[in-house]
Amino acid sequence: MQVTDAHIIEEQKSTPVVKNQTTPVAENQLTPLIFRAVNQYLDINIIQPTESDSTKGFVKWGENNDYPQYLDSLYRDVATLQSIIEGTVDFITGNEVRIDDVVWNEKINDKDELPEELVRSISRDILKYGGFAINVVRNRGGRVGSLYYIPFERIRSNENNTEFYYSKDWSKSVGRVKYIKYPKFDPNKKDGSSIFYYSNNKTNTYPTPIWSAACKSAEIEKQVNEYHLNSIANGFSASYLISLNNGIPNEEIADEIEDSFIEKFTGSGNGGRLVISFANDKEHSAELNKLDVDDSGERYKSLIERARQQLFTAFRANPNLFGIPTENNGFNQEEYDKTFKLYNRTTVRPIQKIITQSLNYILDKTITITPFSLDDENKESDVIQK
């Protein structure tokens, strides 16, 4: 909670207020009115993708080893970001995913998961984090027998990506984290269980999400939504100036009074604010007035529109592809086809190629992704395979 003190003085000079005691009223004494603006706010903390060695062999991703968890939280809390990612996942997965093998095409592991489910999961991680991980398990004969999707936020790596560490919870201190260590997948080795790891960043240990330049924009949309939620929680009530006329308390007592008002009468965030005034007597007190606040609707509308546009720009995507209309309401089939063709070439097909090449490297099988189509009709030349 941020507290701002402001002093309104009746003349240029005033008698200093004695700290840590209630100030008595004296005749003809010039008394300052001390206003404490109770400004509740959500602390914006944009986590940076720093990399630093730990004593356990893996490289920490983020100062507290929580950068991927931060990205995941933005994905879950920012509707525009989630819409872009989920829509693009649909485009990448296409209408059908097939492996040129009867057994593999029916299931990829003992959970009876289909190839399409694996492609959907790893394409989502590529879009969220810039990388993905697959647990490759060999059978007793030494051949690849199962593939398991590993949520990328649960993986950490050593510096050169030859050893990987899996944990369901990296939030604990390094010494208390329980993890499983895996070697890097090598088609020429017979490791019983290993990790295939893909990163779009070949110079660092960890990848870079394609929307990393728009993290601040995602944070803006999240915070604006929090503001409106807190406005609802506060009943859209206007701010008030509350005058307490029994003297000016010391700072400790003033803080306690503030906390009591906040706990009982306000919600969290910036949706509603209280301003509390302390004065020696009624003669020197401020009047109790409802404080007019600016209509924030229009102010935040332009802000959130710009934030959304930055997110679409980061993905090189057109909002109309994801059901979000733009100022130009006209978007006919021809325009849709042209827009999708461009997005398909610049974003969708490159990721499809990464996935098919990766699965081909692991399985030594041909992987085919039939492109996304609204009418379920695809030209043979559009099929992505490796």
Question: Across the structure, where does each feature detected by a protein language model lie?
Answer:
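A contiguous, surface-oriented mixed alpha/beta subdomain in the mid-to-C-terminal portion of proteins
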Residues: 200-358, 368-373
